[in-house]
């Protein structure tokens, strides 16, 4: 079984599905096959808004064997840990990680670390929207912490 894991995105300015998140969801829908499990991951940035996972679930239109919502993931590390938990729960032999191109390498490194000691393959499926200056700066800062975060992800089960 494959797990299609869609990582949420929000800038916290709206209660609606962010266009970056919508693009990730569309990419996931193009990847899904009958029998795949789908993980929609993302939290609510404000108390008055819906979690990204719920917004994606409402917009999801493709058939999937099972749709799992992870409303607790607040960071890429949280996403990776949720992906690993879901992959173990459904017995996935492959995880297709769906995110933005500018986020993909770091997200897949953390997912692989979280799945350390498993035989689960991680494949990356990305969208091609350009990164904002803020996103590029955040990615650069997060890359400096990647070794520590990867060890944390590998040790957390």
Language-model features and meaning:
Residues 1-136:
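A structural signal for short, hydrophobic/glycine-enriched beta-strand patches
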Residues 1, 156-157:
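Actinobacteria-biased recognition of intrinsically disordered, low-complexity terminal regions
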